[in-house]
Amino acid sequence: MREIKFQTYWIAGHDMLYDTNNDLEFRDKENHWITDLSDAINQPERYKVRQYTGLKDKNGVEIYEGDIDQEENGDKSVIVFLLKAGTYCVMPMDIYLNNDYQNESFFPDFIYGFGYDLFFDNCTPDKYLNIIGNIYENPDLLGGAS
């Protein structure tokens, strides 16, 4: 069974809050905090919640939804939870930025074009993924789609 963990990005403070004690109380380095996960979930205009995938990249970095992966050739992807497939996926940056990838009509074309290799169920993140940041703390990385 995978470990269930979350991170919460505080939009106004431009800071990631961590659940360091596994008590679902989230704090940052300056001790800003929220008391539980429901505070963040119920205020999406103030907080963005990221769930741990249960996997690590090739450098041992924990992989969360919203993380950015960079391949050796420089191509970037974003880790997303694809609702239609019920799994985490490595979404190519250009598709992440330019398409409604959660839309049901998009899904068949996505599978036809990329196959199932991008699904975590069918790849080995610990061998191939290289997490270089995330969409909240490193928005500058989103502009480098190739």
Protein language model annotation of sequence segments:
Residues 1-146:
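Secondary-structure transition motif
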